[in-house]
Amino acid sequence: MLQDHGVTHYEEPCPYWHPDDTLQVTNALAINVTGGEQDCDMRVWKDMIDRRIVNIVQPDVMYMGGVTPWLQVADMADKAGLICTPHAANLSLVTICTMHVLQAIPNAGPYLELSIEGTDYYPWQDGLFLGDPFKVTDGHVTISDAPGWGVEVNPDWLATADYAVSAVGG
């Protein structure tokens, strides 16, 4: 039924902590099932990939704790013949980092997740960067080749940001 209406994949159809339920959905559908956006434990990723719980892995570079573990998940998926269409929840550094690391893997999926939530949902992302690093032209974004992550944080945004210090322990 989903494929009859042009749906090409079903993202995280079950709570992520219910992998066996997700596997049942994956086995029942003719379209790809994606998942893993909230997972950060390599044992969970290994199980997800080994058992083919999903057809497409969606690691999130921030949930994963950085580029290195993200690349490890993408590599595990590649060795298993799975594509990687990462999760990127908002228009911040998570999507900027995701755009860059997608260029570094051979099993990148055909899509880049761009948040549809605007300033009503994520008010803090308004004016975060100078320019428009997420500009879509003919269905594509251009990844900057400027130094670092290729973006510049807006100094006016920084001037109005709240700062807090956190500490572990006592």
Question: Can you say where each PLM-predicted feature lies in the sequence?
Answer:
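Extended hydrophobic packing segments that form well-structured cores
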Residues: P147-G170
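Shared catalytic-loop signature of beta/alpha-barrel
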Residues: Q3-H9, P15-H140, S144
